[in-house]
């Protein structure tokens, strides 16, 4: 736990919500007004930029007047480039954030090979530049955030590690080790990037590296320059939400190019969802010892190719195919076909590759055959979710490739085998919808089925598991049973 003023960060404390003022810090009245409005909106930690020593000095009056107005939220100074500004700011606010990429380094974009001794000399220089701030923070009881930015890594880091998540992590850990050498541990780390995929990998790697080194510093999560409107909220939700779902993150900020108080409701929603996930996890009786996903490298799961059409295949290194559910269905097959064709005309680059419809009874078979013929080769695959008996299913007709979506439970081995072989015989594909328990029980049978006519899916998350966790567990079962059907 790191105390930022009276606000505890990390440990069993709630996930804290942060934001940042957008005013000129030297305009004390305007900055104070934003701090007050943020506090009233529910912001728990407020960050203020201090680009120079004059701005850092202005923090004294801002802090005094903020407290005089009756607000207790801690203030944080955001420092780039100038150690002198950091030394001034630490006197007035509860926390100082520094960027290890530019705190003691000027960006020269120089290409240089560092020998081990030359690199060690650079670290000695860092130690000398950062130590005064660490010692003053320790003396005053302040906290520091080591905040790496993907876009501002130092030349030293770039030349040794490249423009990578590993470089981001190592950049922060260099400063952490300096702080620890002085017995200072009131640190928070962040690994921000404008690319959610980069920041997700960097935070996961930071957590893994800290675990290896017996470190447990809190993490502040954020996507830099997310933008505005719905796109910015989605971008932040992808980055921050993915990490919160991993159990990572102690404070968050959703960075919007809007008035800063608009960030708070978005943060609150993300925190609420993370809290619900955490509560579900505590109450779940389903626990798995190891996550099969590799957090630090991306590779596609090898799988057998499934042919929807001459130009559309699924599995292995093919593009991930997108299946959409018809909003109309078989009750009006002509309108359902028109809906797809109109979508193709409006968005020629975004074609429907698979259309999902329900076939609840034999009464709709004629409509299914008509829809299939109407779609022809326009839609490569027609996914048909059904509960009708195998003997009644209409494999006849022409048009889109038929993919039968059928649920199977533990003990349905014979039915599964019959459906799979009948689909293969009729040039159709079976999409077996199974839960984790069923996948375990049916694994031996699944391993005997023709993989080129088989897809594995699940539409119902296992109790106590998020949908992602359910799919990962099913894939683990498939891999252990050497079943390479696409998922």
Segments and roles (model prediction):
Residues 28, 43-174, 306, 312, ...:
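Active-site beta->alpha loop and helix N-cap motifs at the rims of alpha/beta catalytic domains
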Residues 114-130, 135, 155-309, 397-400, ...:
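Catalytic alpha/beta core domains of metabolic enzymes, predominantly
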Residues 3-18, 23-42, 46, 52-54, ...:
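N-terminal glycine-rich anion-binding loops that anchor highly charged ligand groups
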Residues 22-23, 51, 81, 194, ...:
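Structured loop/turn residues at secondary-structure junctions
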Residues 1-19, 134-140, 276-334:
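N-terminal amphipathic alpha-helix/helix-capping segment at the start of soluble metabolic enzymes
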Residues 22-24, 227, 231, 327-329, ...:
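Short, glycine-rich nucleotide/cofactor-binding loops
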Residues 17, 78, 146, 189, ...:
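Conserved, mostly hydrophobic/aromatic
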